[in-house]
A protein has these predicted regions:
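Conserved nucleotide-cofactor-binding alpha/beta core module
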Residues: 2-118
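Active-site capping/gating segments
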Residues: 103-145
Length: 145
């Protein structure tokens, strides 16, 4: 993903906040969306206790991203849609990069999606993976090139 110190990063799937904390050490600001309220609340407490003031967590459906803080330099997704959600593509800054697992429950690929300066998306399959499914994916999505 090549994170930079001034990057604005969207994380989908906060979990307990470990990856959020790691990201917060190397980028400027992290916005993280977690669909499970209990996990989000635990992450908020842990991140606050550890002094991570540059991470904001909210409860919500990651499919929709966090448009109020877009565009993002980087997007990292930790649950797999069958195809890349258009809201996440739309919230990726020109020149930005997204890492996302994509596919069916038994056939997923970790994908690097890059948006060029003209807004075109190029994707590259990195490796086979197995993630939990991204909830709320019931809308048309972007097909990989």
């Amino acid at each position: 993903m090549s994170p930079e110190p001034d990057d604005l990063v969207l994380e989908i799937g906060t979990g307990l906040g470990y990856q959020s904390a790691v990201l917060a050490e190397v980028v400027g600001r992290v916005y993280s969306v977690e669909i499970i309220d209990e996990l989000a609340q635990q992450a908020i407490q842990r991140l606050k206790q550890q002094g991570y003031a540059n991470v904001e967590v909210r409860v919500g459906n990651g499919y929709s991203g966090w448009p109020e803080h877009a565009p993002f330099d980087k997007v990292i997704v930790t649950a797999a849609p069958d195809l890349i959600p258009p809201p996440l593509i739309n919230q990726l800054k020109a020149g930005g990069r997204m890492v996302i697992p994509v596919g069916l429950p038994d056939a997923q690929q970790l994908v690097l999606a890059e948006k060029d300066l003209n807004g075109r998306i190029a994707t590259k399959e990195i490796m086979p993976v197995l993630f939990s499914l991204l909830e709320g994916v019931d809308q048309p999505s972007f097909r990989m090139s």
